[in-house]
Amino acid sequence: TFYYLQGNHDNGSFVSSLEEIPDNLKMFGREWTSYTISTSGKNVVISGVELDCDNAGSIYSSLSLNVENYNIVVLDGQEASHISKNNAQVISLKDLKNKGIDYLALGHVHEYSMGQLDARGIYCYSGCLEGRGFDEAGEHGFVVLDIDDISGKTETTFIPFARRNVYVAQVDVTGCDSTFDMKKRVEEYLDTAGYARESLVKIELTGS
């Protein structure tokens, strides 16, 4: 089963061309939508809402979760403490605290990061699966949740996935007297840096 929450880049996505939505594709709308996965222990409930300018301020008061479940909440937007580069909706982590959330899955930021939401839950940007430019440097992949359905304890693991990663590296060329010397300095750096053959590396020359 696939759970698909559209973000600000998904207008006119592949779904609009489908004559019929497959049964195993679960989607979200402009109001909270929840899907329950029954287990022998705690139920796992995945809840999400697609944000726009009309509902972005009201989703916090309308979120109601059963604390006996393992609650995954899915949102796409920019966490409020960071400046958004585009028209992404702002997500207030403060207003999602103490709601019974175990795992807050966030989309929009293309870099992996994780933090504590409150005493119970964590939040995570899994990032994009592969860097698309030198502004998305570093390792990319996805996050696996291993949930104990009895205790509700969770282990999270970041899984590198990208076929090739993008890196930005600074090479100090102080003391080089020619472009040949600088080229040699860069080659020496690349020989020892350990980048995979498929990597894309942008070299920034520093020094004097």
Where in the sequence are the language-model features?
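His/Asp/Glu-rich metal-coordinating catalytic cores
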Residues: T1-D146, K153
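Accessory, non-catalytic peripheral segments of nucleic-acid enzymes
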Residues: S151-S208
